[in-house]
């Protein structure tokens, strides 16, 4: 018999996590709108040759900070979030098309995007669901398209569960690399954030991965 903790139902994970974000949307916006993630933008756009306009999906767009920034660079952005309040705010802030979709019930289409920007979002997917979600992101990209993702990492073993009302999968660096590769992506770049700190103080793992041509 396994002693591993039981993973909650997807309905509970979604309702509690999205409920938290809906209830704290304004506070979240105020606390994150000035975060400098230019390094992450440059990682995605550089991998795509910095050509504009690119068709980009902001997966887990929140209130729209990155939609605004990437649109201002001349790209065509589509946002996606499961939080109704985040979707409302993102549409208002960016003027972009923003899809209200659960990560567990995606409808993205085939080869619809040149790049996917998944900044601090994929870790909300339970480990058992990651292969399916990553496969859908893979299918949504054109051949040669690029996935950028940034997620908190575990320094010892893969773990998952609720942190307050938000569910998270905290994988090791190798855990994230394995999940991305299993979906068919080829990882081309990895780095840790925040920059300029010792590795033990860099909890965020950023990956740039390409869909083969």
Give, region by region, the residue ranges found by the protein language model:
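Core SAM-dependent methyltransferase catalytic element
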Residues: 196-213
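Conserved class I S-adenosyl-L-methionine
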Residues: 2-51, 155
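Conserved S-adenosyl-L-methionine
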Residues: 185-196
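A short glycine-rich, Lys/Arg-flanked "PGG" loop and its adjoining helix->strand segment in the class I
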Residues: 131-143
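Conserved beta-strand signature within the Rossmann-like core of class I S-adenosyl-L-methionine
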Residues: 144-151
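A short acidic, Gly/Pro-enriched loop at the edge of an enzyme's catalytic core
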Residues: 104-116
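Acceptor-substrate binding/catalytic loop of class I
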Residues: 159-175
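Class I SAM-dependent methyltransferase SAM/SAH-binding core
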Residues: 57, 63-105
């Amino acid at each position: 018999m396994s002693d591993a903790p039981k993973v909650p139902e997807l309905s509970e994970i979604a309702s509690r996590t999205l409920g938290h974000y809906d209830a704290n949307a304004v506070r979240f916006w105020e606390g994150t709108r000035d975060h400098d993630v230019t390094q992450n933008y440059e990682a995605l756009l550089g991998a795509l040759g910095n050509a504009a306009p690119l068709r980009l999906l902001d997966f887990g767009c929140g209130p729209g900070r990155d939609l605004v920034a990437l649109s201002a660079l001349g790209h065509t952005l589509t946002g996606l979030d499961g939080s109704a309040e985040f979707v409302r705010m993102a549409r208002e802030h960016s003027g972009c098309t923003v899809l209200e979709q659960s990560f567990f019930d995606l409808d993205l289409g085939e080869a619809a995007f040149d790049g996917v920007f998944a900044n601090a979002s994929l870790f909300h997917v339970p480990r058992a669901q990651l292969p399916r979600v990553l496969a859908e992101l893979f299918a949504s990209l054109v051949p040669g398209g690029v996935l950028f993702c940034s997620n908190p990492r575990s320094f010892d073993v893969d773990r998952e569960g609720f942190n307050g009302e938000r569910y998270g999968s905290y994988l090791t660096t190798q855990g994230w690399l394995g999940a991305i590769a299993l979906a068919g992506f080829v990882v081309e770049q990895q780095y840790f954030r925040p920059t300029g700190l010792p590795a033990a103080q860099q909890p965020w793992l950023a990956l740039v991965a390409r869909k083969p041509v």
